[in-house]
Amino acid sequence: QWIGRDRFVLSIGHSSLTLYNQLFFAGYGLELKDLESLRTWGSLTPGHPEYKHTKGVEMTTGPLGQGLSSAVGMAMASRRERGLFDPESPKGESPFDHFVYVVGGEGCLEEGVTSEASSLAGTQHLGNLIFIWDDNRISIEDDTVIAFSEDVLGRYAAYGWHTQHVDWTNGGTEYKEDVDGLYNAIREAQKVTDKPSIIRLSTIIAWPCPTKQGTGASHGSALGAEEVAGLKKALGFDPEVNFPAAPEVVEYTRANAKKNAESSRGAW
């Protein structure tokens, strides 16, 4: 808990396990038993992230759109704090400078509250706000085209946002999770200090599941034992082993996270 840290908001709170996995591998208060207790009463891993319940969670999310909208407030508060206590420092050189990162989906963008908050963010020139939109085109009712067909990047450009598109589907021809491409887009967004940024990240939901990837069947219900076994095979895991986490891997990731955190904290 230090004021110069970046903030991360998982606006798609139902994807909480992706956050819990990162906290586990970083050694940030979660152990394997906590992952095994996902969505059970009293566990540290509830169905949606809860602030002050699980270490490393910046805010409670769940109602779609709440995370992105609140992140706009976080970005405004950060700028206000800097203006009060360190207004003279060049951009990027104040101990109060940090970014607010948000991951959200179509469900967040369909909500009116995000339209209002995003318009405000553009008007306020919140260059410390970076929103990654997981564009998988799937809702619980299958293809989002039945209810959501607008030009999102065009709308956000009209709000005054900086826009980028990273297409992991390569136009629907081949799926490749180009992490470097996403990283480079984030770095470009960091350079734009007079506008908030949105990165459209085109993905395939539930990839590489054998039969349910890219379908509504993978959105709001369990995959099932057969599908999970196929997924494990596709990823090179033993389909008979649950929660594989080699001790040497966990030791490495936690040491690496600690080293990077100490370096960032020291620079701050």
Language-model features and meaning:
Residues Q1, I12, E88-E93, H98, ...:
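Conserved acidic/glycine
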